[in-house]
Amino acid sequence: MKRQLILEDGSFFVGERFGSLKETTGEVVFNTGMTGYQEILSDPSYCGQIVTMTYPLIGNYGINRDDFEAIRPHVHGFIVKEACVKPSNWRGELTLDEYLKEKGIPGLSGIDTRKLTRLIRQYGTLKGMICGLDVDPVEAAAKLRAMEWPRDQVRRVSTKSAYPSPGRGERIVLIDFGMKHGILRELNKRNCDVIVLPYNATAEEVLGWHPDGVMLSNGPGDPKDVPEAIEMIRGILGKVPLFGICLGHQLFALACGANTEKMKFGHRGSNHPVKDLRTGKVAITSQNHGYTVTHESLSGTRLEVTHIALNDGTVEGLRHLDVPAFTVQYHPEASPGPEDANPLFDEFLALIREFNKKGEVIHA
């Protein structure tokens, strides 16, 4: 069955339907990863987006039980050049098509994904609609241009109540702004005693758990849409070691007086080189973000840039000069992608132990 993708600029792409038949709208973005589509589909950071995979053949190893990053997906659509109909992998239990149908996610295949990607690179991310051929592109484009982005995406994907993931090591409070399970898995590997809190937890609630450290997770949307989190971060700075990832990095920067802005088309993929300015080493990282901390806004703050993206020079890591806190824009847990940056979790635990030695950590 033929379906189409209509963009807000009036352009449209006709392809083959797979997955759900429902009509959908969202921000059309692209991901440059060759693999990891299951983790991408289940990453809450993609809430409200229609994801285009630049690699031409997707679905080769099917869908398994183990590689999900959240209980349910939040993507609004999935676009590929070719969707594999006969996957081959010993763990695979569903085809990509079967999974999308089960979760109600519309898919589109057979379009020129290279042309679509170049369009996004040239003009920036665009609002789009996956729909039937009976929809008029001109009328749909006008509706898309008038459509406003939702501002409550973090609320949609965050846990509604606190829950534990017990361990015998350091107690970590993990703030869930749309947390990937990969972050929790990395903390569990290190035997951390984790308490997951919702995005709107107050500083008093966070400190009430008497944590050894606080982690700020990834999540979707504009960091300025989560003012309560910015206030919470200000309330805990200096009282407990802090480590932020992706959206958590941006919220930390805002809490410290810096600014963020929307990128033209963002960083999404598992092959982004990042340079550590302290060591000169380069790591290949997994990334998924459409906003960035602006260099010029760091002047006058007590933040130091620790990492930059080699492709465009944007800020990829920050460290506070006065308190035990650091953040990165990329995903050290990978899931999917390379694990070059995985030692950052160990760096966080080392920071906690150093903080404890000084007798500064808050306990009951």
UniProtKB/Swiss-Prot annotation:
GO molecular function, one term: glutaminase activity
Active-site residues per Swiss-Prot or TrEMBL entry: 246, 331, 333
Keyword Amino-acid biosynthesis among record annotations: yes
Database matches in NCBIfam families: CPSaseIIsmall, PRK12838.1
Chain intervals for the UniProt region annotation (CPSase): 1-167, 1-171
Protein family (similarity comment): Belongs to the CarA family.
Entry's EC annotation: 6.3.5.5
Gene: carA
SUPFAM superfamilies in the cross-refs: Carbamoyl phosphate synthetase, small subunit N-terminal domain (SSF52021), Class I glutamine amidotransferase-like (SSF52317)
Subunit structure: Composed of two chains; the small (or glutamine) chain promotes the hydrolysis of glutamine to ammonia, which is used by the large (or ammonia) chain to synthesize carbamoyl phosphate. Tetramer of heterodimers (alpha,beta)4.
Organism annotation: Bacillus caldolyticus
Name assigned to this protein: Carbamoyl phosphate synthase small chain
Start and end residues of each Glutamine amidotransferase type-1 domain: 171-358
Keyword tags: Amino-acid biosynthesis, Arginine biosynthesis, ATP-binding, Glutamine amidotransferase, Ligase, Nucleotide-binding, Pyrimidine biosynthesis
Binding site for L-glutamine: 45, 219, 221, 247, 250, 288, 290-291
HAMAP family cross-referenced by the UniProt entry: CPSase_S_chain
Role played: Small subunit of the glutamine-dependent carbamoyl phosphate synthetase (CPSase). CPSase catalyzes the formation of carbamoyl phosphate from the ammonia moiety of glutamine, carbonate, and phosphate donated by ATP, constituting the first step of 2 biosynthetic pathways, one leading to arginine and/or urea and the other to pyrimidine nucleotides. The small subunit (glutamine amidotransferase) binds and cleaves glutamine to supply the large subunit with the substrate ammonia.
The keyword Nucleotide-binding is assigned to this record: yes
Catalytic function, reaction form: hydrogencarbonate + L-glutamine + 2 ATP + H2O = carbamoyl phosphate + L-glutamate + 2 ADP + phosphate + 2 H(+)
InterPro entries: Anth_synth/Amidotransfase (IPR050472), CarbamoylP_synth_ssu (IPR006274), CarbamoylP_synth_ssu_N (IPR002474), CarbP_synth_ssu_N_sf (IPR036480), Class_I_gatase-like (IPR029062), CPSase_GATase1 (IPR035686), GATASE (IPR017926)
